[in-house]
């Protein structure tokens, strides 16, 4: 028997609105034949207090107790996984990503946005990289791999599981990164994004190897870069830097605290422009570097890592965003363009914009909003799960 979770009275309201999370405080009691049936990552049925079926999902110890896979009574077998991956693939085909010679890397599965909470799958040419954020998805990884093989066929040569850093440590699953199927001669692979070339290392790189969620925003940087002197902070692999130089920037400087990241940015510059690119790199803390940059730059990119992964640290995080933006706004040349981002799920669009407004006031600059940015369409947002809109950005014109 599949373990059954019964909700407290009235706690089914979010499920009636098709929200895919059930919080631990909503649970009244649990029925299971054996305690072992109710292990971390187990498939569970969810019922109202009165015994009305509501959903099937993966159980996990923690604040989010159940991640809903379906609101229907259905068997979660190989055919189910094949269908879910096929539906995600069809969405990307609609977006002209699956057979696009100019873009060979994209996100295939984006968790709740594709009704597969706890799962990320990114495609890098012939290699699929899986990251499981829940124990339930980790237990299903071989079924997921089989579904990927079914959907992609011979176009896929390897499937790499990179879940060791994304699984909850309390689950104690002993996950080890490695190939679930196939192999690759090299852990690095050259991919195309809007015609720009990037070397991606899914084994050693951050996330799955590349930040795919900035694809469209990088293209916008390219549009504004012509003739400008560009500073790309928190550069990682230099994605924004490559696009800026491709767009005709006069000079680009890439800054990151990681020497390895700076080396990757340089490698990608050489890959696209050879050894004579008008590019410099600095291994330094970006916040400290911005203390005194003078008026050299007229296009600055601020794309920091998440300052607030939890609401408990939100106050300190917003102070950090304010300080970072104030430093850039106070020193950017008149007529300059600032691209500023937050990837913190806990930071709403309204809060981020208010914080940037206060930074502009501190800097004493007249500022216009030119664009309000978000994640691309291959990182879709489940309309019933607004928390999925994690990336927010502003493009500012600074007088």
Where are the model-predicted features located?
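Non-catalytic accessory regions of SAM-dependent methyltransferases
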Residues: 1-123
């Amino acid at each position: 028997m599949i373990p059954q979770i019964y909700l407290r009275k009235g706690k089914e309201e979010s499920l009636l609105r098709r929200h895919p999370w059930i919080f631990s405080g909503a649970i009244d009691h649990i029925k299971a034949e054996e305690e072992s049936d109710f292990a971390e990552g187990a498939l569970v049925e969810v019922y109202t207090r009165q015994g009305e079926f509501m959903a099937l999902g993966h159980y996990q110890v923690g604040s989010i107790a159940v991640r809903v896979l379906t609101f229907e009574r259905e068997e979660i077998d190989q055919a189910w996984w094949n269908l879910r991956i096929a539906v995600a693939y069809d969405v990307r085909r609609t977006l002209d990503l699956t057979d696009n010679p100019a873009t060979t890397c994209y996100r295939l599965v984006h968790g709740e946005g594709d009704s597969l909470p706890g799962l990320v799958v990114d495609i890098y040419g012939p290699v699929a990289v899986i990251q499981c954020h829940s124990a339930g998805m980790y237990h299903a990884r071989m079924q997921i791999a089989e579904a990927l093989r079914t959907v992609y066929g011979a176009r896929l040569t390897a499937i790499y599981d990179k879940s060791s850093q994304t699984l909850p440590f309390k689950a104690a699953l002993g996950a080890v990164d490695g190939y679930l199927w196939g192999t690759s001669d090299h852990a690095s692979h050259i991919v195309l994004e809007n015609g720009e070339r990037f070397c991606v290392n899914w084994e050693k790189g951050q996330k799955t190897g590349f930040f795919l969620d900035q694809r469209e925003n990088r293209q916008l940087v390219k549009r504004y870069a012509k003739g400008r002197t560009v500073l790309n902070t928190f550069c990682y692999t230099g994605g924004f830097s490559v696009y800026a130089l491709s767009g005709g920037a006069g000079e680009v400087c890439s800054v990151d605290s990681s020497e390895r990241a700076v080396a990757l940015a340089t490698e990608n510059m050489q890959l696209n422009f050879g050894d004579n690119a008008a590019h410099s790199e600095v291994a330094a803390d970006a916040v400290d570097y911005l203390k005194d940059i003078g008026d050299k730059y007229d296009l600055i990119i601020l794309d920091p890592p998440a300052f607030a992964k939890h609401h408990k640290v939100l106050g300190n995080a917003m102070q950090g965003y304010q300080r970072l933006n104030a430093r850039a706004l106070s020193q950017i040349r008149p007529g300059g363009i600032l691209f500023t981002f937050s990837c913190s799920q806990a930071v709403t669009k309204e809060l981020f914009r208010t914080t940037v407004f206060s930074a502009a006031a501190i800097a004493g600059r007249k500022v216009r909003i030119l664009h309000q940015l978000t994640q691309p369409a291959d990182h879709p947002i489940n309309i019933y799960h607004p928390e999925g809109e994690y990336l927010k950005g502003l493009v500012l014109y600074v007088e």
